[in-house]
Amino acid sequence: ISMDITSNQVWWAEFDTYKVGTARNSCSKMHTIHIKSFEPDDFSHEGIDAVGGNTKECFLNTLKELERLRILYNRTKDRIYWRAIIELLPSGYNLRATVTLNYAVARNQYHARKAHKLDEWVTYCAALERLPYAELITMEGKS
């Protein structure tokens, strides 16, 4: 199985616990974080939106500060600004990667994570259900 996935750093940290039978080729955050402006859509922020108020304001202020640091880094190339960006970056920042895994790993992930409290796992498991030969993953019809 090979697929492109865009998800937040929290989800990727959990995905990376599956090391055997997987490969991940990511777009490097370290080399590209300063290229484009920070926008709310670069982040998973559904929970922040649901809570609203000061939480939403804090998120938007963080984006403003990240953008200020990005501009300073691009202007000066001083790595202290780049380092501050990496340290301040919320874990909701979305990263894109191509993953390759076998059906055995997908089956393990599916059964361990299909009812997970992170919505991203539920979405991922739904994508696995749509794959050819998904019954090898879901084990539906097997006794």
What are these regions (language model features)?
Residues 1-143:
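Family-specific signature for flavin-dependent thymidylate synthase
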